[in-house]
Amino acid sequence: MINDIQKTAEGKMQRSVEVLKENLAKVRTGRAHTGLLDQVEVEYWGSMVPVSQVANVTLLDARTIGVKPFEGNMAVKVEKAIRDSNLGLNPAAVGDLIRVPMPMLTEERRKDLIKVVRGEAEEGRVSIRNVRRDANDHIKKLLKDKEISEDEARRGEEAVQKLTDKYITEADKLLTAKEEDLMAI
């Protein structure tokens, strides 16, 4: 029973870290990466689809993303979708290739982004702690119902705490890496 609780808790904590990683990846640094356009959608045959489904998205250099639509007539729509995406990007079409240069971040904008990143990391840590609380509550319920001994309950809570420490450390490492990435010029 305790092992099931631990496995469930670990899976949920792992998912919390993955969500944090995804959220941190969405925060734009001065460096280009193709994942930046994952959330941008463009109209194609009457429905909204991600840019990656109608175009080849590549890195041209460290500060420029290249977007080459599979169909030439989509270039204008893709360019407009990127411009209207609230990412602060200014794409420029060069023939059938759309160049998306990454604007330099100002010092003030970097500090604002660091606040956002720290908030995301704190949400991740809170999520991990909530999983710990739920697991410990489940263990206490089993103890109260006399399905496990006090020693088993204590060992279970200690194991859940170790998992919590492990995943909070992982979240902190992600935060530190993102902060360093943001402050690099």
Swiss-Prot record:
InterPro entries: Ribosome_recyc_fac, Ribosome_recyc_fac_dom, RRF_sf
GO molecular function: ribosomal large subunit binding
A Gene Ontology cellular-component term: cytosol
Primary location group: cytoplasm
Record-annotated disulphide pairs: none
The keyword Transmembrane is assigned to this record: no
A biological process term (GO) from this entry: cytoplasmic translational termination
Localisation per UniProt entry: Cytoplasm
Keywords, ordered alphabetically: Cytoplasm, Protein biosynthesis
Family as reported in the entry's similarity comment: Belongs to the RRF family.
Reported function: Responsible for the release of ribosomes from messenger RNA at the termination of protein biosynthesis. May increase the efficiency of translation by recycling ribosomes from one round of translation to another.
Protein name: Ribosome-recycling factor
Organism listed in the record: Neisseria meningitidis serogroup C (strain 053442)
Lineage: Bacteria, Pseudomonadati, Pseudomonadota, Betaproteobacteria, Neisseriales
Name of the gene this protein is made from: frr
